[in-house]
């Protein structure tokens, strides 16, 4: 019998900077799972799942929560729940996860036209950006009126200024628009800014709150909103195959970090990112965005850096990178930080002698997690990913 082709065994997240999704369950989480409730969550009978939903909803100042297997699912069913009869359009940042990384879900599930907007300040959408791309429901039959604004906090690691969110919310209320937040990393925004989740909840009609990124849970997201909204969203979760039976184990594991000092964990990861950003700036390595939280985005195009070379340099030091997108989480060690500094510095120096042509077909992120030879070159071909 031919053996299955399996990936290498995953050992540790301490050297993995590809994404904050690579956090691994702690011993405390594994122990908690053994004591989890075993009710049927599809019928609303699982105690720990309900406890998780209510806990996150209350933290965000919302009436109800809905546990979903992923942020993609919670985003998509949230937007679908807000929308009624097409034609309509959704307005979001051109880099938004709901637009670029969710397999055309908005077009397929919500039948919506998406209006992607480039922020005029380069970092986040302002009210003026939104107004200039808003499609009014003014009787013009050629357009698809804007019904919903979707904002991401954080996006590219940038914390959305609270005062700008307040301005956008007021305008949405004046114009009868729903405001959704992809809060995959809203925990990071709350920790860094000091703005409580409840205050964000007062601004948005719905928030998708991820549990499996910086928070470290193995799976899941909680969609929060008012009771009527969540009741309807439950139908769409079922329709999309997202109902889970005994989800208590996953819920119990997620509650471990929520009930612990999650802010300190996140701020630790932010401090590593801040230190790397300062190092890059001191070396003259250009960055794409401010390193507000746990991400450092190296401007590979401006630096003429080859992302494959950067990945290989990381592997030389046993650090896993995803191109110029360096993502920190609470399980990354300071030793890894020092190693990634060396990898980036060497890739930058290499680019000075061998500038990379960035004008061909581009990919957003590149990654490889295989072994390397003595020179730091990957043994297997570098794999290219969008996310």
Curated annotation (Swiss-Prot):
Q: What is its EC number?
A: 4.1.2.48
- GO annotation, cellular component aspect: cytosol
One of the entry's Gene Ontology molecular-function terms is:
L-allo-threonine aldolase activity
**InterPro entries of this UniProt entry?**
ArAA_b-elim_lyase/Thr_aldolase, Low_specificity_L-TA-like, PyrdxlP-dep_Trfase, PyrdxlP-dep_Trfase_major, PyrdxlP-dep_Trfase_small
Which EC class heads this enzyme's classification?
Answer: lyase
Recorded catalytic activity of this chain's protein: L-threonine = acetaldehyde + glycine; L-allo-threonine = acetaldehyde + glycine
Q: Which UniProt keywords apply?
A: Isopeptide bond, Lyase, Phosphoprotein, Pyridoxal phosphate, Ubl conjugation
CC cofactor:
pyridoxal 5'-phosphate
Name by which UniProt lists this protein: Low specificity L-threonine aldolase
The organism's taxonomic lineage, starting at the top: Eukaryota, Fungi, Dikarya, Ascomycota, Saccharomycotina
